Amino acid sequence: MATTSYRLVVAPAGSQRSSTGNVVVTTTSSGSHSSNGANGGTGGTSAGSSTLGSGLNVTTITATSGGQLQSAGNTSQSNGTTYKIEMLEEDIQSLGSDDDDEDLISSDGSLYEGDLGSMPVNDDVAHQLAAAGPVGVAAAAAIASSKKRKRPHCFETNPSVRKRQQNRLLRKLRAIIYEFTGRVGKQAVVLVATPGKPNTSYKVFGAKPLEDVLRNLKNIVMDELDNALAQQAPPPPQDDPSLFELPGLVIDGIPTPVEKMTQAQLRAFIPLMLKYSTGRGKPGWGRESTRPPWWPKELPWANVRMDARSEDDKQKISWTHALRKIVINCYKYHGREDLLPTFADDEDKVNALISQSGDEDEDMELSNPPTIHTVTTMTPPTGNSNQPQQVNVVKINSAGTVITTHTAQSNTPAPTIIQSTNNQHVTTTATLPASTKIEICQAPAQNQQHHQHHQTHLPNAVHIQPVAGGQPQTIQLTTASGTATATAVQTTAAAVSAAQAHAHSQSQAHSQSSANQTVTAQQIANAQVCIEPITLSDVDYTTQTVLSQNADGTVSLIQVDPNNPIITLPDGTTAQVQGVATLHQGEGGATIQTVQSLTDVNGHENMTVDLTETQDGQIYITTEDGQGYPVSVSNVISVPVSMYQSVMANVQQIQTNSDGTVCLAPMQVENGDQLETITMSPGMHQMMIQGGPGQEPQLVQVVSLKDATLLSKAMEAINSGNVKSEDTIIMEQ
């Protein structure tokens, strides 16, 4: 079963736009007209669909403000806005008549007559291809021959997309030719030839022995093809010595717009462009004397094969767009914009197909007609002021993207949404009135819940509110490919306001719950915490400390003995510490951080304080010889003073439960200037607590907790404020 993809374009058919009103969806075709609609009250909707002979399904939407349906052939009313929705089926399977099938086999050259000069004058793509060399001439001739059959296909100007289409169609051709030879029993082959040395390509597959015969005739076929193309090639342009010489943007023999060049193609093309622009063999990266005057000032003069910009600049503009700006600046500086290929947009291609639909053959049918989605615009009531005000809501779902527009004013024109698909990419352009609000967010995974949550859950939302009375703004969004649908939802202004108020109340409730989690020192001191006994004998508690989580999951308490400045880090290395950082509680309950050198602590001289903490969480400890040792801190937990005072007091009374856990009994410790010295039981290290100025220094060491999550859970339970007095909390692994 073949996969079918569609392209949906919604665009105003005329330049005049009226106020929001009823919408009539009609369908036109060459020789047939079908429409269906429904009326009710002051508004109505009419929709229809048909299949053109060219495989192009066109639906026209007309918005009227008088409550009447406007037919496609009635031109007496001009107060409506007409939109066209064109769905182009990519894989169109045609079933022609028996005479046409017979003509496909028996005709000798009837499909291709004339030369490139007989092509339409407005076919800019073919003329640019023909001027690019032998490969472009061959491509232009192939396009001209396909237009003899008036198929609704256009040349793909994007090289990446063109490559994917080539591989996909070659696989389809291979399957078709083998099916043809097997079902019909005829000698048939598919020959794909690309001229132009040295990149000559010659592929042939099909029924043998005809396939082998054509393989052996490769040289003869390619020579004849080159001669035939040389006769149809346009004359080479005259060289103008007044123009600066720059290379043309030609990728694999095909002129390619700079907007559609990939990053790899741009990186390979810019050095060649610099040779023409500067006249030097090498660019001279990094030297300001060799920097061209047209090089963008915001980009570093460095090799374009790597992005040497800062992280902030990388967030502003992608590297691919920066490379495209380099190319455009060079060609504009030398006055050679004529060498930048420009092709018609997708919307222009659609309009060209629509204009040619009346002259095309009606020998094609859509095997699977596409579904036409109706776009409805609700009209705000004008007669009864008690009715709720209607809000226009237009949503476009396209591969994980939702665009919602709200128009609260009744006299505001309806938004104009233009959606174009370029194979794997969908470009959405919304032209909106100045008072329209746009919300862009990621679409939810489940479509059935989208209507319930599209107003309250807006991750990565972008809100755009233009100034009232200003000019309409255009917002362009590019996403991954997907089936594009246009729908309309009836809602009221009160419903939109209620949804916004609900989201605001939820945010306030979350902030209030976070504020209620603050606990006092009395609550912390009266809490009882049970910790697994695996590391109690290794832990020395001090008035203040910083816990750092190691890469292996352990938590290290980095502490320093004033009598021995050499410490052992968790990774086994040693370092000399020149200062001790402590925290104490100052006036008003504020926590103050101080740094004392070991000279102030134990009277040693020639010691300086040099502790540096970088933004990425690393702490640098500098030794006497000036060598810095980085200490990686991936997670820092700050513990209040009152909590550590409570824990230190509780350490004196150790209780062992039946399950092997050790409980710390609650004990209240008053905050004072004088702090006592606590001596632990045998098996525990002696611990001294440093008090105010003049007191004995604290004894500190480097210890490690084996289970980082254990202590984190206990501290989280205490800080949550849910711990009651005399309760026991047992944290299990």
From Swiss-Prot:
Entry keyword set: Activator, DNA-binding, Nucleus, Phosphoprotein, Transcription, Transcription regulation
Tissue expression per record: Isoform A is highly expressed in possibly all embryonic neurons and is enriched in adult heads. Other isoforms show similar expression at a much lower level. Transient expression in migrating myoblasts.
Region (Disordered): 13-51
Motif (Nuclear localization signal): 146-174
Modified residues (Phosphoserine): S97, S110
GO CC annotation, single: nucleus
Cellular localisation: Nucleus
Compositionally biased region (Low complexity): 18-37
Cysteines engaged in disulfide bonds, as pairs: none
UniProt region (Required for transcriptional activation), positions on chain: 375-663
UniProt KW Calcium keyword: no
Region feature Dimerization, mapped onto this chain: 69-136
InterPro entries in the cross-refs: NRF1/Ewg, Nrf1_NLS/DNA-bd_dimer
Listed GO MF terms: DNA binding; DNA-binding transcription factor activity, RNA polymerase II-specific; RNA polymerase II cis-regulatory region sequence-specific DNA binding
One annotated GO biological process: positive regulation of canonical Wnt signaling pathway
DNA-binding region coordinates: 167-379
Superkingdom per UniProt: Eukaryota
Xref: Pfam families: Nrf1_DNA-bind
Family under the similarity heading: Belongs to the NRF1/Ewg family.
Task performed by this protein: May function as a positive regulator of transcription in developing and differentiated neurons, regulating common aspects of neuronal differentiation and maintenance. Requirement in the CNS may be higher than in the peripheral system. Vital for development of the indirect flight muscles.
Alphabetized PANTHER family for the sequence: NUCLEAR RESPIRATORY FACTOR 1 (PTHR20338)
Assembly and interaction partners: Homodimer. Binds DNA as a dimer.
Name used for this protein in its record: DNA-binding protein Ewg
